Amino acid sequence: MGILDGKRLLITCVLTDASLAFAVARLAQEEGAEVVLTGAGRGLSLTRRTARKLPTEPEVLELDVTSSEQAEAVQAWLEERWGRVDGALHAIGFAPEACLGEDFMAADWDDVRVTLEVSAYSLKTIAAVVAPLMPDGGSIVGLDFDARLAWPAYNWMGVAKAALESTSRYLARGLGPKGIRVNLVAAGPVRTMAAKSIPGFAAFEDAWGPRAPRGWDGDDPEPVAKACVALFSDWLPATTGELLHVDGGYHAVGA
């Protein structure tokens, strides 16, 4: 018996089997959940291929979070096929090249707008898809990178993560009376496809392991997946609006 027996989860942005979302989907299935994946654009074919590597191959739905039509179609599919949803994982993030790198001032508003819409506002989009299908409550979990500090080269993605954190708190406040919990998991740096596209990502890795009290393995997504699965379970019923650090303790220490 698993801690997610009978639960139905929407998992976004599984690109490869190195994705954090893949690790969450796999562990969720192992703990008894039924999952459906979403992908978008050129990444949709990657999601479909990667879905075959899960213990049970799930359905893959197209969801560009900037498209209200696709969001409505996903909601309609979930309602028709499942009738209810118990949880959703937000693992979505994107920034144009100008929003990353050494020059924070290089990005114009059009680039920043895309970054904020895809990486932060999309949490509200996912909540709008699943909340009506959670009559008995549920759990929305987002993947985050701690935005309290300014990181090398992270630039406007860091700003978007700060917006994501604020959005999660307001969603927690608004959806709490309906029994829906909203939390984020602030992960340490993990070598995913998305992470490798960030200029200066190696600087995060190099600093993390030696400073984290519990150490940190950037090749191991399991601690992050376990935290997400715990938040999807019924074991944390009073936890919402939380930013759960899964980073080996790096966030808690100084120099």
Predicted regions and their residues:
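Canonical Rossmann dinucleotide-binding motif of NAD(H)/NADP(H)-dependent dehydrogenases/reductases
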Residues: 2-37
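Catalytic loop of short-chain dehydrogenase/reductase
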Residues: 13-23, 93-132, 136-177, 189-192, ...
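A short hydrophobic alpha-helix cap/turn motif
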Residues: 29, 83, 134-135, 173-178, ...
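Conserved Rossmann-fold SDR core element
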Residues: 34, 165-168, 172-194, 221, ...
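The beta1-alpha1 cofactor-binding region of Rossmann-like NAD(H)/NADP(H)-dependent oxidoreductases
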Residues: 45, 63-74, 222
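A glycine/serine/threonine-rich, flexible loop-to-helix segment
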Residues: 49, 177, 189-213, 253-255
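Rossmann-fold cofactor-recognition segment
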Residues: 51-69
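C-terminal helical subdomain
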Residues: 121, 184, 203-239, 244-248
